[in-house]
Amino acid sequence: MRFKNRFQRFMNHRAPANGRYKPTCYEHAANCYTHAFLIVPAIVGSALLHRLSDDCWEKITAWIYGMGLCALFIVSTVFHIVSWKKSHLRTVEHCFHMCDRMVIYFFIAASYAPWLNLRELGPLASHMRWFIWLMAAGGTIYVFLYHEKYKVVELFFYLTMGFSPALVVTSMNNTDGLQELACGGLIYCLGVVFFKSDGIIPFAHAIWHLFVATAAAVHYYAIWKYLYRSPTDFMRHL
């Protein structure tokens, strides 16, 4: 109780079961900045992977991954700005909140795309290349139908989609980069604690954003190091 009283201006009460948490102005600002600052690095990083690509398939994969990465930070930033400054536009805010939730599904699919597209897979495992996008489409439909109604179910979908392709990736003959992939996944899972702690921990959602940024950086490093060329090769091609 003493902790809550001390930080009351930085945190509001928890949201009802079927409602959305209302951040304080401080939390709104933190939510915006923690992802806004990552938009440019995401764009630059995506362009770097495209530049390092050897063939058309690697370029396509770089664009898929890059678009998912950039979309995550852009949509999140726009939603939090609208939620902070234009909250009176209920319909607009609701639409962007849905987009913010839907883009997570496609970001998960895009994050696995380099591993599924550029590594040799067995006949059964290769089906995950398209099945993960089917899961993303299913998650999008779920958001349209049940947005904010069953939060635990939504969280279960995110975690299931995040872990399912990992089972396939770990079965590949070439295991380079899997430690970084697992490390990033663990960081995402730890961040979920803060994702579900609005109204309990001040700036919980902004802290969740930092976990997302850290995990995404670890995964990007693994993709850059093990699936694309080294900086030395890149400089040679300039």
From Swiss-Prot:
Task: Indicate yes or no for the key word Transmembrane.
Answer: yes
Q: What residue stretch is flagged as signal peptide?
A: none
Single Gene Ontology MF annotation: protein kinase activity
Cytoplasmic compartment ranges equal 1-28, 83-101, 146-151, 196-198
- Membrane-protein topology: Multi-pass membrane protein
Main localization is: membrane
Q: Which residues lie on this side of the membrane: Lumenal?
A: 50-61, 123-124, 173-174, 220-238
Disulphide bonds in the chain: none
Cellular localization per UniProt: Late endosome membrane; Lysosome membrane
Q: Report the Pfam families cross-referenced here.
A: HlyIII (PF03006)
Q: InterPro entries this protein is in?
A: AdipoR/HlyIII-related, Hy-lIII
Instruction: Name a GO CC annotation attached to this entry.
Output: membrane
In its UniProt record, which GO terms are filed under biological process?
A: positive regulation of neuron differentiation; positive regulation of protein kinase activity; regulation of protein localization
Sorted UniProt keywords: Endosome, Lysosome, Membrane, Receptor, Transmembrane, Transmembrane helix
Indicate the transmembrane segments per the record. Answer: 29-49, 62-82, 102-122, 125-145, 152-172, 175-195, 199-219
Family to which the UniProt record says this protein belongs: Belongs to the ADIPOR family.
* Functional summary from the UniProt entry: Involved in the dynamics of lysosomal membranes associated with microglial activation following brain lesion.
Name of the protein in its database record: Monocyte to macrophage differentiation factor
Its encoding gene is what?
MMD
